[in-house]
Amino acid sequence: MDISFLVFITLSMALFSSNVTGTSVTSRVRRGINEKHCGFRPVITRIIGGGIATPHSWPWMVGIFKVNPHRFLCGGSIINKVSVVTAAHCLVTQFGNRQNYSIFVRVGAHDIDNSGTNYQVDKVIVHQGYKHHSHYYDIGLILLSKPVEYNDKIQPVCIPEFNKPHVNLNNIKVVITGWGVTGKATEKRNVLRELELPVVTNEQCNKSYQTLPFSKLNRGITNDMICAGFPEGGKDACQGDSGGPLMYQNPTTGRVKIVGVVSFGFECARPNFPGVYTRLSSYVNWLQEITFGQSLASLFEVVPIFIPE
């Protein structure tokens, strides 16, 4: 009698394969996780002073919501079809517990309350160094339960290149977007807003924050952070903008790269206290490990093969 044995093809075996669906594993690692069409805006407008964004001009922008009670939490950015990068503090409760299945993501929205498509969350990943009583390692990743469908309202943003040094952003203009509060009772926060800001040196930023009794900032402003804001204050990210992108748009190609994630600040738009952002280039390897692992999981599913004896 022939006996069939069930043999499982595992991920470790697949990694020895030189080519999978025409693309080598090693070349995928070297190439990084940016999609080739990332960072292109279907609607390109000039930002003058900041205000309400042209609808769908930042198509990677997402809103993160709490399920029960239903309320808006934070912003985030699509970096591929199943991954949204945001701030760790958006994904952890005040008691240090992960939100996990108590949140969902809304993509393709301009009016965050009345437009867009909801996606369920498969997994929440918070950087292993993050502590809810600290501002360090403030980065997290949301993995969606199914891939988003790209269109003129939904696109991925580029992230910094894999295995490259920090880019000097001092004196560079960057852009933030979000549905956070504006401080003006007559202005709604349900429509996406945009603001161009100058980057502030970490040295100057640290001088300002060292004057505060910040228990969450015992190591000061580090190289894993970016500061941006006007010396006179008046315009800044605020409550509800957390987790959203700090972006740089290449003036030649028009391509947009997310360089930071809205993390924290001293109140909102205070003079000489710029907003502080998690520097994405410090965490590209971390993002690479997670997102590449997810792509491998989809490529190398466990497949049963029956071999007759």
UniProtKB/Swiss-Prot annotation:
GO molecular function terms noted in the UniProt entry: serine-type endopeptidase activity; serine-type peptidase activity
Disulfide bond keyword on record: yes
UniProt note on tissues of expression: Expressed in the hemocytes (at protein level).
Annotated InterPro entries: Peptidase_S1_PA, Peptidase_S1_PA_chymotrypsin, Peptidase_S1A, Trypsin_dom, TRYPSIN_HIS, TRYPSIN_SER
Regulation of its function: Binding to (1->3)-beta-D-glucan to alpha subunit, induces autocatalysis and activation of beta subunit. Inhibited by intracellular coagulation inhibitor 3/LICI-3 and to a lesser extend by intracellular coagulation inhibitor 2/LICI-2.
Disulfide bonds: 38-158, 74-90, 205-227, 238-268
Family: Belongs to the peptidase S1 family.
Biological function: Component of the heterodimer clotting factor G which may play a role in defense mechanisms against fungi. Initiates a (1->3)-beta-glucan-sensing clotting pathway whereby the alpha subunit binds to glucans containing (1->3)-beta linkages, which are components of the fungal cell wall, and the beta subunit catalyzes the activation of proclotting enzyme.
Protein name per UniProt: Clotting factor G beta subunit
Lineage of producing organism: Eukaryota, Metazoa, Ecdysozoa, Arthropoda, Chelicerata
